[in-house]
Amino acid sequence: MLRSAPLALGLEPHPLNNSLAFPVFYHIHCYCPSPLLLSLLLHYTVLFSPFGARNHKLYIYIYIYIYIYIYMCINVCTYMNAGPRGVCSLCVYVCTHFNIYIHTYIYLLFVY
């Protein structure tokens, strides 16, 4: 009962040292988002951002980064025989770092 309590609270083992970490940026099953979904998200931020189209180079870099991430995430999960929604530690690690970057980017975009 007590051993399952952290999981009930939303805590997961950290992929590197197996300690519990609060998954603020973790996917539940390490989803690999589709390019269409991410493209729609970025087009939305371009259309409604306070910066407008002035920083179009920034958006191009973000696009490139996202597609590299998708390629890496799908290949890693397939290589680990976990499938695109598998819970392999390396895939979770990649997804976690991507989530930190994209959430930070969106936060900075709408705050500054």
UniProtKB/Swiss-Prot annotation:
State what protein this is by name. Answer: Putative uncharacterized protein YIL100C-A
The GO cellular component terms are: membrane
Annotated compartments: Membrane
Reading the lineage from the top rank, the first entry is Eukaryota
Q: What is its main location?
A: membrane
* Transmembrane region(s): 33-53, 58-78, 91-111
Keywords, ordered alphabetically: Membrane, Transmembrane, Transmembrane helix
